């Protein structure tokens, strides 16, 4: 296990295009690093406060580059994040929850299509397929960029209309092993987007309810971080130790469950999956969706 280099996150961030008063944190490498094959790519985050977050991982990337002659170290095109990249007054506090849900269903998000923007935590990698959540942090232009950059992979755009704040996929749609996914019951994948899963005998089951009614203090995520588990292999999963319902469900689904106390870290950026990024894998790239059908999610 390697750890990022601490940075001074409370200092202002400034570029020729914007200024913001502080950074974010280095707790969630899942948001920044995307591993595909022998390549680790730094993301093109849409939050201005995360513009220089990749610097926390720069020493590790440089180390991997020097140690492994086959390692590819890349950076996605950096977005400028000018005012044109966002819809103004999108987060007006006078907008009701019902209106937010209507926006999500209509795929009306704060980001525009001026430039590709994406967080790595919006990308669910399943062998030869990339399922990318279209939401507040990743736009459709980013998916088109992925399609061109990885022509040998299939890129799918998915969205979850029940989520009023769709940011990242790991508390919504989580693969546990080939053929099995747990889905947030409040944010179900629409029926028309399930065709590719059904054609390849994947089972999508509702996730167990969270054990808590409210998030811990200062946490900006929902109680559904209960789903934000770390899958070690096809039989082993780490779950936050207080999430008794989720652990019970994992056990019934045939997983070996490792409870990990982690709730106190939620305020710094997320759950167990958020706090990790895999940098080394064994085996080849499998095709878990060989049966291709008329798929509305395909980019």
Predicted regions and their residues:
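The feature marks the mature, well-folded catalytic cores of soluble enzymes
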Residues: 1-299
